[in-house]
């Protein structure tokens, strides 16, 4: 905070040199690592399995229902190869030529004991669109974890759903023992790659925040092939967020990883040529869960929120991450090309947690963050046993402002509960924009609509439910018994010279009455209740997490570069 303004300007405006960017450039093609784990079967493996079964039988409460293995959360065990000539009601716009993908948890094998929604193996559901025709495909991300469990024909890695009480400590020891005895090969990590996807430098990445990215290739017929693990020529030695940011103006990618050992946060910049630059450790007092962050043209914004990694709490029957309602929410704003953390500015706001940010930008002396703010968080709500209610889970759209000159921080409520999974026209990432599209929720985990917000309009404060009016321009209601997932905005044209909301929203929908899954395409400008197109799918698509649209140009560029 004591640095001069001229120093701060130099740090935030100066990009890395050409020499730094090119340091590993000639090796960039080798940054995809073929995943070839070497687990071992034998007497030791069988003995540990037997011990585990006995302990689970006596120590695990199997009477508790595993909610996220039932209904449309239940996995589909089989992959679906490209299924072409799908029925399309309406017409698919030309700008949707490409592949719409959504990843989510889909456990291939039944859990040994507990199960949390975050635990399942990553399965990608894709809709290849070309010239008005659609093809559906689903494929597992071929992670090291999945390969090894296929080898054993059963679950072997511990799960978040197990990590409660003394039983949780036992399950941790079981995995450590299996790794020590080389029964499990953890040299390629433990990733499920089940959370989100992003495209950068000719590569489509499947992400989960506990490990490194997996590279997915989109084939011409829409099929999805796992190429391997991305370690940026061994420069990535820590976890990698599920929500990195790509600046559409510079083609750079910005990311971070969090850890339960110091440094708890590590910030990274990846050049437009796919070179990962030196790590920037971020100092915070305790290890936390930090699911998302944000960038502006000149800054990166870090969220030190009080969801702490506290293993001792598991003895009390809590999960390994515990929310502390007595602590302030802290936001760190760092010049995004900083070589270290010396120029970071920290701002305090009232206690909260944030899973997902919409966008951020600079407005005079202020840095503005648009986010979905949660007053409290209990990860047990997405554990095995869950009440399908919204009580104690009040996610709302907020505007937060951090004044880089005065050090003041303010926040403003922009919506009634409950909204999340905010998406924008990503041509505006890191720049001032107007429209945000969020999912609305019928209960803790089921999406019942898509809401369009106008950040230029004043919100109607005091409302308990979401209604059109004020800053709510439109709500697309899925109707009774139908539930969706994150909607991705696809612009009619690239760039920022056309109207920001001129485009379409595309998302998966499941009808719990008929058991049918579909893909909806709606007009993002008008939010008309009549979809532009509906595509009938050949099989059930379980509820999942984040989605992405790979356009035709990216598919062709990807095929040329990988």
Curated annotation (Swiss-Prot):
GO terms for molecular function: carotenoid dioxygenase activity; metal ion binding. It comes from the Eukaryota. Pfam families: RPE65 (PF03055). One of its GO terms (biological process) is carotene catabolic process. Keywords: Cytoplasm, Dioxygenase, Iron, Metal-binding, Oxidoreductase. Its cofactor is Fe(2+). Expressed in leaves. Detected in roots and flower buds. Its EC number is 1.14.99.n4. It is found in: Cytoplasm. Residues 1-32 are annotated as: Disordered. Binds 1 Fe(2+) ion per subunit. Belongs to the carotenoid oxygenase family. This is Carotenoid 9,10(9',10')-cleavage dioxygenase 1. It comes from Oncidium hybrid cultivar (Orchid).
């Amino acid at each position: 905070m004591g640095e001069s303004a001229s120093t701060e300007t130099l740090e935030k405006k100066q990009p890395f040199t050409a020499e730094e960017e090119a340091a590993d450039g000639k090796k960039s093609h080798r940054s995809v690592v073929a995943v070839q784990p070497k687990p071992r079967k034998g007497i030791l493996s069988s003995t540990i399995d037997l011990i585990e079964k006995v302990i689970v039988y006596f120590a695990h409460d199997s009477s508790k229902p595993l909610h996220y293995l039932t209904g449309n959360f239940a996995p589909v065990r089989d992959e679906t190869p490209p299924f072409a000539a799908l029925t399309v009601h309406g017409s698919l716009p030309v700008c949707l030529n490409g592949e719409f993908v959504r990843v989510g948890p889909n456990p291939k094998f039944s859990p040994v004991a507990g199960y949390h929604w975050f635990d399942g193996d990553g399965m990608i559901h894709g809709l290849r669109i070309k010239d008005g025709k659609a093809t559906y495909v689903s494929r597992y991300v071929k992670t090291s974890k999945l390969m090894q469990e296929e080898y054993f024909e059963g679950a072997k890695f511990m799960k978040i759903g197990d990590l409660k009480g003394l039983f949780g400590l036992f399950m941790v020891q079981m995995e450590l023992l299996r790794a020590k005895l080389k029964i499990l090969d953890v040299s390629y990590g433990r990733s499920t790659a089940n959370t989100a996807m992003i495209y950068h430098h000719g590569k489509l990445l499947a992400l989960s925040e506990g490990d490194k990215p997996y590279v997915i290739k989109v084939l011409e017929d829409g099929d999805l092939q796992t190429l391997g693990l991305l370690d940026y020529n061994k420069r990535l030695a820590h976890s990698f967020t599920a929500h990195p940011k790509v600046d559409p103006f510079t083609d750079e990618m910005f990311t971070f990883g969090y850890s339960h050992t110091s440094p708890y946060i590590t910030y990274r910049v990846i050049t437009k040529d796919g070179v990962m630059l030196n790590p920037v450790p971020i100092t915070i007092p305790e290890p936390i869960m930090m699911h998302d962050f944000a960038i502006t043209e000149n800054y990166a914004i870090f969220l030190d929120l009080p969801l702490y990694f506290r293993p001792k709490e598991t003895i009390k029957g809590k999960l390994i991450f515990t929310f502390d309602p007595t602590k302030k929410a802290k936001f760190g704003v760092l010049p995004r090309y900083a070589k270290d953390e010396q120029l970071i500015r920290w701002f305090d706001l009232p206690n909260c947690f944030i899973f997902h940010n919409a966008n951020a930008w600079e407005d005079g002396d202020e840095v503005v963050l648009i986010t979905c703010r949660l007053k409290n968080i209990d990860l047990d709500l997405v554990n095995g046993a869950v009440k399908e209610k919204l009580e104690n889970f009040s996610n709302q759209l907020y505007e937060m402002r951090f004044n880089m000159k005065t050090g003041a921080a303010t926040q403003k409520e922009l919506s009634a509960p409950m909204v999340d999974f905010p998406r924008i026209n990503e041509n505006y990432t890191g720049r001032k924009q107007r429209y945000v599209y969020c999912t609305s929720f019928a209960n803790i985990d089921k999406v019942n609509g898509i809401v369009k917000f106008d950040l230029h309009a004043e919100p109607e404060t005091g409302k308990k439910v979401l209604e059109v009016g004020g800053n709510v321009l439109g709500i697309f209601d899925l109707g009774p018994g139908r539930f969706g997932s994150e909607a991705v905005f696809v612009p009619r044209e690239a760039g920022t010279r056309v109207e920001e909301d001129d485009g379409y929203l595309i998302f998966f929908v499941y009808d719990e009455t008929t058991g049918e899954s579909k893909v909806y395409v709606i007009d993002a400008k008008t939010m008309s209740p009549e979809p532009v197109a509906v595509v009938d799918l050949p099989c059930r698509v379980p509820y999942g997490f984040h989605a992405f649209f790979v356009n035709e140009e990216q598919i062709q560029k990807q095929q040329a570069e990988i």
